[in-house]
Design a protein with these regions (language model features):
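Short, acidic/turn-prone active-site loops that include or flank metal/cofactor-
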Residues: 92-96, 143
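Short gly/ser/thr-rich secondary-structure transition/capping motifs
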Residues: 118-122
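Conserved N-terminal beta1-alpha1 strand-loop-helix module at the mouth
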Residues: 1-87, 95-98, 102-103, 107-109, ...
């Protein structure tokens, strides 16, 4: 079976609720939430994505797939764990060191959430080998 995770990044605020209902009818499996802080990446979507998560929390049971493209991963994890997402993916390169990567993995898993670890294409995959037994998904960014 194939799962579909639908990104809400380009949905206009005034259409979010209608769009969510249409995507439910289309049997999407997850809502993909692209969280950007304007520091780790150029765009800043944090406020609107947080607002979308609040809407989703009230109108649907479809699980969330949170993708954190942020510099301060620890604080953003806390902001999104309250929505009980299915998975939170964060960027290896956003962490100060490997200890911080493991701390974040543990924190996410302690909250009954799956963990995804994202890497930039130029990052040597060997750098994350030690984390593979502890994560559910590895995402190699190409954007």
């Amino acid at each position: 079976m194939v799962d579909i995770s639908t990104s809400l990044l380009s949905v206009k605020k005034e259409k979010i609720i209608d769009t969510v209902y249409k995507l439910e009818d289309a049997n999407t499996n997850y809502f993909h939430i692209d969280v950007m802080d304007g520091e780790f990446v150029e765009n800043d979507t944090h406020d609107i994505m947080l607002e979308y998560c609040e809407y989703l929390d009230n109108i649907t049971k479809i699980p969330l797939d949170i993708h954190l493209m942020v510099k301060d991963v620890k604080n953003f994890v806390d902001s999104y764990l309250i929505f009980n997402p299915n998975i939170i993916t964060f960027h290896y390169e956003a962490c100060k060191n490997k200890e911080e990567v493991m701390q974040i993995i543990k924190k996410i898993k302690e909250n009954n959430c799956k963990v995804g670890l994202s890497v930039k294409p130029e990052t040597k995959i060997e750098e994350i080998y030690e984390f593979l037994p502890y994560i559910h998904m590895c995402l190699v960014m190409t954007v």
